[in-house]
Amino acid sequence: MLPQNKDQVLPQTSVLPGCPPWGFSQLVDSSPHNLQPLSAHQSLRPSHPPFFSTQSHHPSFSPPASPSPGFQFGSCDPNSDFVPHPCSPSLPSSPTFFHQNYLSLPNPRASSPSNHWLYPSPPLTPSFSPSQPQNSSLPHSPCQSPSHPEDLHSSTLTSPGPSPPSQRLHSNRQTWRWHQYRDTGSGSPGVVERCVPSEKDPAQFRDPGALAQALVVQLGHRRIAHDLRLLLLQHLWLGRTGQAPVVEYPICLVCLRPRSPSCPLPKYRTGPRLLAFPQLLPCVEGQESGPLRIGIGFGLRLPQGQARALHLLPEKRPKEVGPQGKDPQACGHPSPAFQPPAAQARADPAPGTPSQTRSFRSAGLQSPNSPRCFSGPPPRAPKQATTSPKPRPCPAPKRPVSLELILQKSSV
């Protein structure tokens, strides 16, 4: 509590222009343990004007003309405490706060002899003067933020401290927005460009390389090289030597630009992406050894249906058909499952004549008198060789044997 006599706080002598002004450290008790927040419900008496007010470069406030719990650091009421709040959430961010803010007395009447400017001392060092006794009877108050909005206005501008965390979070949020939406190519952070359809249809390229080059121009070679360099250094730092560094950029095939929140949703689950990867360049012709050169290769990752719709895949060749558009097996050619009569005869051989059965098989296909069980031209030797997976060479008979002789021997 302040003494009852006002002369102990501020003498009634006017300050001459040549005399040094009073310091801020002589008016406020600098002990941080003896500080107590100023109550917002306490006001000054109408007969006394406020002691002095502040003018900061952060908020612009005018000194109150009527008694109000505004920016008042002292009062003449003996029931009020002349102590600002030690830890306010609206602290200045600059440590040179006392060099940028000045304290001034209100000027209601020019005839008042005590109206003069007060400049606070830059260092806030603990000092005690005989004009102000040490306030040791005040209870210790914890450093906490005011619970009412009125306390916020009545407890500001105390001592230099660190910048509030709200300003740092706001700056980080702007940086995060800029990194998030910088893919759109906008000049200002946080501004998202609209998805404007491109003048050229992606289906007109008909080449994945040409479409990839058009997307690279919109994205920028310098940015791709920077991102790929960072990814390569990250792989080397983490020891991922087995994985090739590949940078993927989601793209929009409507505006032919990197994808932004304003672009329409892709039709497929995996949207189109532009791939960038390091590529080893060949040496110069005529030089066996030289410096290692690394380039950047590009590719597109598209769903198969979307790539086929954009005519980026080679067309499939139609299957070869016969002259009349029919299956070759319908013309009377034997199929692999078809067995000629010689094969049927081999399936049921005579009990004692295996060699005669083999000769019958070889002679049955070569003799002109053998019966035919299918219509159409006779099968050719090369085509029959293609139908059987592994044709066995038949042993040539030592002498020509007629069909009648073979039948007579088999019946005995």
Swiss-Prot record:
Cysteine disulfide partners in this protein: none
Ranges in a coiled coil: none
UniProt feature, compositional bias: Polar residues: 33-45, 353-372
Region feature (Disordered): 33-75, 123-174, 318-412
Bias type Low complexity, positions: 126-142, 334-350
Protein name: Proline-rich protein 30
Gene of this entry: PRR30
